Regions:
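ABC ATP-binding cassette signature C-motif
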Residues: 1-254
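Flexible nucleotide-interacting loop at or near the entrance of a catalytic core
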Residues: 2, 106-107, 113-129, 144, ...
Length: 317
């Protein structure tokens, strides 16, 4: 187990007056299956780019001891066999194999020393069994072995999506950032991918498909207008907690409004009484209208703050 630590991070794109993230801090466990939710434009894909190092924070830090990979993963040569495409997503196995053959053929002491180092890397990446592992994982996603011999570009978009997910999860010390995987999946493909991801751990998933999130994740990051929240549970758990918070704040705001009305009426009555006393020149106790008015004003500020949060919560839905 390790963690991803975001500390006091601020980020804005060049030329923008508004920060996407401002002084945010949170911690993620790399064993979590984390769903990343929030309205469009709130910075979900931007945050994945920050983790990948494709963007840099203006201030603050992101610390992690894992290697990040991003889905979708580009495959430049669609004419290569699907098996070879999957292998290349994991490690440069074919290049390593070619180089090891060259070193063995050379046979010098120096060449054999380099061969030993390269073979160790090959073994640590499961190079000797990688084809079997790819075949096994692809089968879990309903991709038959014969499809792995076809050109990658001839696979359906759904097959390419599922095979890419399978390959990336075979990488060692890898934390996967999955951006909208259901875009090219039909209902059966979503079921297969959801079932597959539910059996994995160690990823962040961005998806607008709430049912898919429910089947897959065990934690949720919520990107709100003012902050970022991390909660345990799937999307439905997060939604239930959010609705309860909204209902609590609504009830609290209604109570505040009743108190404001009571204080305002009290201040008005006291003012009328004080004015009558002053007009009749009769001395006596005076009522502090300023104090009551100040207290009512503070309550109104709290009410407005709650209403703003309620509006932001409604916009998130």
């Amino acid at each position: 187990m390790s963690i991803i630590q975001v500390q006091n991070m601020t980020f804005a794109y060049d030329g923008s007056y508004d920060a996407i993230f401002e002084n945010v801090s949170f911690t993620l466990d790399t064993d979590w299956k984390t769903g990343f939710i929030g309205r469009n434009g709130r910075g979900k894909t931007t945050f994945l780019k920050l983790l990948m190092g494709w963007e840099r924070p203006i201030s603050g830090t992101i610390a992690a001891s894992v290697h990040f990979d991003y889905f979708p993963f580009p495959v430049e040569d669609g004419g290569q066999p699907a098996m070879e495409a999957a292998r290349s997503m994991i490690a440069p196995f074919t290049a390593w194999e070619r180089r090891m053959d060259e070193l063995l053929a050379e046979g010098s002491e120096q060449a054999l020393a380099v061969y030993g180092e390269l073979q160790q890397r090959y073994m640590e990446a499961d190079g000797y069994i990688i084809d079997e592992l790819i075949t096994r994982e692809a089968a879990k996603l309903n991709i038959p072995e014969e499809a792995l011999q076809r050109p990658f570009g001839t696979l359906s978009p759904g097959e390419r999506t599922r095979l890419t997910l399978a390959a990336l999860f075979l990488k060692k010390n890898n934390f996967l950032l999955i951006d909208e995987p259901t875009n090219h999946l039909d209902m059966e493909g979503r079921r297969l991918a959801g079932q597959y991801l539910a059996g994995k751990k160690g990823f962040i998933l961005v998806s607008h498909d709430r049912d898919f999130l429910d089947r897959v994740v065990d934690h949720v990051i919520s990107v709100n207008r003012a902050d970022i929240e991390v909660q345990q549970g799937n999307y439905s758990t997060w939604k239930l907690n959010r609705d309860r918070q909204d209902q609590f704040e609504l009830a609290r705001n209604e109570s505040l409004k009743r108190d404001i009305a009571r204080l305002t009426a009290s201040a008005e009555r006291a003012g009328q009484w004080s004015d009558r006393v002053e007009a009749s020149k009769i001395g006596g106790h005076t009522y502090d209208r300023g104090y009551v008015g100040h207290k009512a004003a503070k309550m109104m500020q709290r009410s407005k703050s709650i209403e703003r949060r309620q509006l932001e919560a409604a916009e998130e839905k």
